[in-house]
Amino acid sequence: ATCYTASNAIKITDTSATTWNGTTWSNGAPDLSKLAIINGNYDTTSHGDFECCSLLVNLGFTLNIQADDFVLIQNDLTNNGTLNVLNNGSLVQVNDLGVNTGNISYQRIASVKLQDYVYWSSPVSGFDVNSISPLTPGYYHWQWNPTILNPNGGEGNWVNASTTMLGGKGYIVRAPNGFSNTANQ
């Protein structure tokens, strides 16, 4: 079978589905030809990575993608439950036109020294820049503005960021106050 999506006029339903019930998949492991439905808690450490045509996480259930694990979705993601991507875990949505609905929580941990800056980019919108590192003073949160003049007479400079992150836009945040300049913490 092939992974199909709906057109404007006709929906071709050739995609089989498999449902996770907390213990096993109803129709074999998901693959790029199947809709994967999470109807029981799923953790990639215990149950493994998977690929699917589209993914549905039902209300009341949690999908945890752990460090060094992945879930690859060819098309659409509908999250009505809880979806957590932990540090160094990966959620990959292949189709640029794929629809992504629901909230996703990403955890990222950076090992930094006091004067280090970490570059962040928001794959999803709606996260407060100040929440990246609550112990870092707000005047060390920056975003790039390509339209203002810089001290060298060119265009583009860093400006203070005290806003909600926008998808695909980059930010830099300094390490929290109290961190050492000599040792990673």
Place the predicted regions along the sequence by residue:
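Short, exposed coil/turn segments at beta-strand boundaries within extracellular/luminal domains
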Residues: A1-S7
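N-terminal exported-region signature
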Residues: S7, S16-Q185
